[in-house]
Amino acid sequence: MITKLLTKVIGSRNDRTLRRLRKIVKEINNYEPAFEALSDEELKAKTVEFRQRIEQGENLDQLLPEAFATVREASKRVFGMRHFDVQLIGGMVLHGGQIAEMRTGEGKTLTATLAAYLNALPGKGVHIVTVNDYLAKRDAETNRPLFEFLGMTVGVNIPNMPQPAKKEAYQADILYGTNNEFGFDYLRDNMAFRPEDRVQRARFFAVVDEVDSILIDEARTPLIISGPAEDSSDLYIRINKLIPLLQKQDKEDSEEYRGDGHFTVDEKSKQVHLTETGQEFVEELLVKNGMMQEGDTLYSPANISLLHHVNAALRAHVLFEKNVDYIVTPDGEVVIVDEHTGRTMPGRRWSDGLHQAVEAKEGVKIQNENQTLASITFQNYFRLYEKLSGMTGTADTEAFEFQQIYGLETVVIPTNKPMVRNDMPDVVYRSEAEKFAAIIEDIKQRVEKGQPVLVGTVSIEKSELLSNALKKAGIKHNVLNAKFHEKEAEIVAEAGKPGAVTIATNMAGRGTDIVLGGSWQAKVEKLDNPTQEQIDAIKAEWKQVHDQVLQAGGLHIIGTERHESRRIDNQLRGRSGRQGDAGSSRFYLSMEDTLLRIFTSDRMAALIQSGMDEGEAIESKMLSRSIEKAQRKVEGRNFDIRKQLLEYDDVANDQRKVVYELRDELMSADDISDMIAQNREDVLNAVMDEYIPPQSLEDMWDIKGLEDRLKNDFDLPLPIQSWLDADNKLYEEALRERIIEQAVEVYKAKEQAVSPAVMRNFEKSVMLQTLDTLWKEHLAAMDHLRQGIHLRGYAQKNPKQEYKRESFELFEDLLESLKSDVITVLSKVRVQQQEEVERMEAQRRAQAEEAARHAQAQHASADDAEQDESNQPMVRDERKVGRNEPCPCGSGKKYKQCHGQIN
């Protein structure tokens, strides 16, 4: 109550931020007349002036009003477009390292130019991050004339660029690129062997476009550079043939319940588990097919790999559906479909053998499982930037997560013109067929009025179902989904024409505005060297059509299902009503929709369905509230999963930083002989401790064992027993010193034989190679540790604490192994000449380049929801007894009055 009153009096936090920024907008506007009077040359000279002022000690905040006024004036001259005041506010929010929530059509791309120009002045580089290559290239080309007018360089960072071109792109003042590519470049740089092979500069400032998509939807997607591991294609194919023989066990409370099924499915957590019957049946099948020994069990240590394959195949068959979760391309490749955007994600693969299992299910060529060589999550990559900001049309629902995980405030930027879109309440039907019939009727009416319609579906399968229904009804339409990715921009350009009907999967086409009346620019682009007269004629024709569409009611949005996240529903709605245009939206739902089926209580579902006739719809505030509650529940669960994933990845992240810093140090150093000398002493002392325990009697020493060990591991044939026999006063300390001195002398002699310069190169090369090999093995060990850690909950231990403790022990082992492996190699290998070192370097570089080609963003599988098994609900084996049924104990009382009270 008091909070509400205070908000009314002093305004919300957002209002207060906007009030502060509006004062600076006035200051920027005051510069406008003076800047309008400048010649082009004088305006261009401002960049040099600002850079000099930074050198003299001025900071970016002091330069902001003049810098923004410069960009606005340059934009008027280059594009004929003047930044609105709200865009200036958006630019200031981005510069402040915050998230600007700007509605669709409010000009986010132009807003970003303000913050990008200002932050590029110190010469450290600005990265503008987009969701795909098309948008990166489009935005870079669109804004290039403006930045170049102001004396700034612009680059594009997209996949498969030659290394010199990529290095040059990173030197640009402003670099546009995709989130995947920036992350992969970071990993590739940390696999390089020479400083000149690296492409990135220090990460100074990033503006993330569609920030919710990249930092939230993609947050569970680790970027992984991997190399092929062992080939087990045959096993996937053989196990795949067994899975169709298994039967699903129905839910206990369903009418057709049978307790003898082989597996259970949990739709909420996307998990599938073998029942006891199922385990026995699978074991029988494996024995029969010669994949397991008679009397053996699936859960014995020797069969861990077999169990992994069975689980992957079961999930592939039961949980992953063709044309919903993935598509199969004409050349037989299984490509993941992003559940959030409906786009395909070529190059991405599910981990844990799931992708191979899906390939076996679809009968296409199975790619080998991969071994991780380097990996990072987007969460940890973007936290490497000194300053991070973002833009999106919908961030407010996830403001808490941005604040919690990235420390980013969200500021809602007001629209330039008031929003007049009519958002109608949801309507709910009994079945999907009734819902589709109502949607088609609505589309017909809109088309007759000449109103364009955009229909949002949640999967490719649903978009094709609806498309077929529209064909039957004789309604012309376009389909925008992952299968027709190439035509995307063309279809979006047409989507605003009178009576145009476009079906879009989720947010395919995001980042491209739907202009009412269609895009006049697209028409102009089709002409060869158009004259000004032709352009004016096209514009005049477009204006007429634009007004006609506005008269008909603007763009009408139809949602065919509620998404798990309110944000994605809001994104669909946000396609309409841009820049104060007319528009409307409505969601059509049915009791068969996934969200309603899983999250609406049985009682409410029965209540709704009992009072409805066929084809009848229901509009109810209670139902809308119930749906929103379900969405909040899912969002909360997804937030917990992402937060948990981050907590686990933070452990690996700290270790990654240490390893990458050590690599940097090794690469930039010309001479690491001091480090090698220290390591040699540590390693030899540790070996001597095993055979000559510190402060022990001579009788406890194992001199023969020590002599053998030094000879075998370090190529040091030392007559230690003879030394001791010859000198009664050779005590432990003196003996240790003598052994180390001998080791140093032998090493120096080896160095003189090939020259110190060759030896320095060889040391560096061996150290880097050993570090990379151990890091790769460490990542695999961390993966295995991670997969089973939740079972510690059974022992009343905190899985997260256990993971931290054990991963720290693994990391300590890595550092110890690094020392001993390097010293062993340097002691035993005989280097003849510099060419050998160079050949070894070249071989390693070739391997790294091959691995870098295996860069892929892997989907964290549903297992990443790391459930603490100790808190799992108990599962009942016998039939559920109704409250009013006779108690099974035979007392004759009702169950609720007998044993039901105890339960």
Swiss-Prot record:
Q: Which UniProt keywords apply?
A: ATP-binding, Cell inner membrane, Cell membrane, Cytoplasm, Membrane, Metal-binding, Nucleotide-binding, Protein transport, Translocase, Translocation, Transport, Zinc
Binding positions (Zn(2+)): C887, C889, C898, H899
What does the record's cofactor remark say about binding?
May bind 1 zinc ion per subunit.
Primary localization class, coarse? membrane
GO terms for MF = ATP binding; metal ion binding; protein-exporting ATPase activity
Q: How does it sit in the membrane?
A: Peripheral membrane protein
Please give the cofactor(s) recorded in the UniProt entry for this protein.
Zn(2+)
Residue sites binding ATP per the record: Q87, G105, E106, G107, K108, T109, D513
Q: What is its EC number?
A: 7.4.2.8
- Residue stretches of biased makeup (Basic and acidic residues): 840-853
GO terms (BP aspect): intracellular protein transmembrane transport; protein import; protein targeting; protein transport by the Sec complex
Q: Which InterPro entries match?
A: Helicase_ATP-bd (IPR014001), Helicase_C-like (IPR001650), P-loop_NTPase (IPR027417), SEC_C_motif (IPR004027), SecA (IPR000185), SecA_CS (IPR020937), SecA_DEAD (IPR011115), SecA_motor_DEAD (IPR014018)
Pfam families, A to Z = P-loop_SecA, SEC-C, SecA_DEAD, SecA_PP_bind, SecA_SW
Reaction(s) this enzyme catalyzes, per UniProt: ATP + H2O + cellular proteinSide 1 = ADP + phosphate + cellular proteinSide 2
State the similarity comment. Answer: Belongs to the SecA family.
Q: How does it assemble?
A: Monomer and homodimer. Part of the essential Sec protein translocation apparatus which comprises SecA, SecYEG and auxiliary proteins SecDF-YajC and YidC.
Q: What name does this protein carry?
A: Protein translocase subunit SecA
